[in-house]
């Protein structure tokens, strides 16, 4: 038995200079797992709660000492002597100990850090890589794939201090034969984009996720500049590389309207969906995330009706990795894909349940980082171990993003042909 003999929590720093929770789980025999919870900027209102201290004299109120104390006291006491390989049991113990719908007693950041650390400790105990352990927990042992990266090379919205309303403009190197080749293509486009921006006299500073954050006249301008960079890098837009957007529309939804302040346009719900469709008619956009507010379910039905057969429509703030909300979406034919973020739901077991539910309903599942990240690369193993097929982990700079890409390179090297890179086939509506 992989007996837990100690659980340790500590406060560490995330990529935005804010505190977050790191946990260690120690087993008999010297096996140790360590993991850290990420943190979001544009967050869904129904996400599990990230417990912050609120003490303005420390880290401007963003300290996590209360969550850390919960790890070192209540959670530690509850898990001592338990089997680390029994992931579902461990997670349920913590969920029951918390006893709230959104984990606001112990904090989703506390529970998640321990949940992931336990999985890493269990993998070490079994002598297998984390992705292999996750595949076993998922009921799909040995079934792997390398994910298509959605590379966020131009940032706006809550991730950048500029006038661009849409939060993420991403490239997907779908024409690559391997993940390694896809990463190289993305890096070359990223560096070429820097040159294009520089030559136009535009800012080459980066946002939270490592993408460039220039001021632009319109959201369409962002797509035009990326198109220029893709072609200048020697690739063909539409076959070698496709585009994806994360609108994070909840962030500019005001009084029932979608207010694109950066370009001075205001849309009603259907009008904004029509606007997005017009962009997709001009450029090879194959995936749109959070194209409407999380509460605008009638609008989502219309958006799915007009674009859902050809474009992947991803629910992030809409579904918040929550099976109860996803069930409603599936029953009502809302969207056709879910974004998967560990900390929206707060445990590995619940995360795997959301991925499984999505796949069984014919939805795709896109594994994602948060804008506040650490060097923890667990999402790379999650993407491969569940054969999710797609990953969002930022741009090609900032080591908090690149850590995930580097872990994927290592995994591909280990697995070779056992983890195929399927390109466009992974994206809903493109197979």
Curated annotation (Swiss-Prot):
Alphabetized Pfam families for the sequence: Enolase_C, Enolase_N
Keyword Lyase attributed: yes
Cystine bridges: none
Cofactor(s) this protein cannot do without: Mg(2+)
Main location: cytoplasm
Listed transmembrane segments: none
Residues annotated as binding (2R)-2-phosphoglycerate: 167, 341, 370-371, 392
Cofactor note: Binds a second Mg(2+) ion via substrate during catalysis.
Localization: Cytoplasm; Secreted; Cell surface
Group of enzyme by EC: lyase
Pathway: Carbohydrate degradation; glycolysis; pyruvate from D-glyceraldehyde 3-phosphate: step 4/5
Biological processes per GO annotation: glycolytic process
EC number: 4.2.1.11
NCBIfam families from the UniProt entry: eno (TIGR01060)
Family label: Belongs to the enolase family.
The protein's role, per its UniProt record: Catalyzes the reversible conversion of 2-phosphoglycerate (2-PG) into phosphoenolpyruvate (PEP). It is essential for the degradation of carbohydrates via glycolysis.
Quaternary structure (record): Component of the RNA degradosome, a multiprotein complex involved in RNA processing and mRNA degradation.
Protein name per the record: Enolase
Species name: Shewanella baltica (strain OS185)
Lineage, broadest ranks: Bacteria, Pseudomonadati, Pseudomonadota, Gammaproteobacteria, Alteromonadales
Gene expressing this chain: eno
